[in-house]
């Protein structure tokens, strides 16, 4: 028997990390977002029907270290001193919970968290509206911004929608 992997819950998080090594700056960002303990698999932009949005704390309680966890993630890295890095995920909730919504990912250099969040919402809203021909019930974003330190160490910024099966 094949089990369908349809998430029942989702939580949103973000993080930023810095380190002389690019990979370790990503690890630091995952730690800041509290999702470093999982084997993350990035997926595309669908919020499943009837998927409950929970707090990060609630979602983390249902996951185990080493678990394969699906997520929609925006990620950006640089070691260019003074450069501002911004990531965001946006969400468009369906009017009818029996239908799916959309999650977008967006990242940019030299853009404010507010602007990146607005752009991520615009993307999610557009994907939803062009499919349903209606406005979503609600939209929101989880933006994060940070600036590369003068030391030239790597900075990574992430935003993620993390699914719980």
Curated annotation (Swiss-Prot):
One of its GO terms (molecular function) is arginine decarboxylase activity. It catalyses: L-arginine + H(+) = agmatine + CO2. It comes from Methanosarcina mazei (strain ATCC BAA-159 / DSM 3647 / Goe1 / Go1 / JCM 11833 / OCM 88). This is Pyruvoyl-dependent arginine decarboxylase 1. Keywords: Decarboxylase, Lyase, Pyruvate. SUPFAM superfamilies: Pyruvoyl-dependent histidine and arginine decarboxylases. Belongs to the PdaD family. The gene is pdaD1. Pfam families: PvlArgDC. Binds 1 pyruvoyl group covalently per subunit. Its EC number is 4.1.1.19. Its cofactor is pyruvate. The modification Pyruvic acid (Ser) is found at residue 45. GO terms for biological process: arginine catabolic process. InterPro entries: Pyr-dep_his/arg-deCO2ase, Pyr-dep_his/arg-deCO2ase_sand, Pyruvoyl-dep_arg_deCO2ase. The record marks 44-45 as: Cleavage (non-hydrolytic).
